[in-house]
Amino acid sequence: MIAGIKAPDSTIARQAEQYAREYSSDVLFNHVMRCYFFGELFARKRGVKVDHELMFVSAVLHDLGFTEAGKGPHRFEVEGAHAARKFLLDQGVQEDRAWQVWHNIALHVGDLNLFKDEPTRVMQQGILYDLTALPPDLALDPNNVAEVLHHYPRLGFKKGFLEIFTAELDSKKPYPHRFHLCSCIEHHRSHALNIPKPEDFLGSAPFAD
């Protein structure tokens, strides 16, 4: 029990956590676990009913694309979604449920998950809370946050996560990701589009490291 939240104890939840633990560094594993608990805290704060198992599996497997389990030529969130779906199907999870997890993971980079159903939105907010500054109305109880950090410390996450991204970019040249067409047009048309430095994006998170 962490901050009044108990992670699901189903067979597939335990298997997913073990799989993420096996392939992830300490920095990455602690990140995905924090994301789950932060998402649950947002769900509790907003009174949103969630499928706890689906949210847990989606959260703990969402960065497999940075690991050996999700190696491949495509960008990391797509490779991670493929790896998670294959893992779930291999464990006997139903096809439609495995696809739900695929969508949650493949769309977690950017803002698309924030426009989906409420359970997906709070899961995405949990991920974003660990990464960057969020509006004041999305603040969480500091005592609950501290309890999550006690169990899953950040271990220099801001620097460590940037290094993980750098290694991902170095492994795939040219990187297989395209800017949104509207972003490209606005950048070349007005040169006013703000593209933040990664150090500023990650550095804005409300944590020391």
Residue ranges and their predicted role:
Residues 53-70, 80, 101-111:
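His-Asp-centered metal-binding catalytic motifs of divalent-metal-dependent phosphohydrolases/nucleases
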Residues 67-75, 92-93:
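Short coil/turn segments at secondary-structure boundaries
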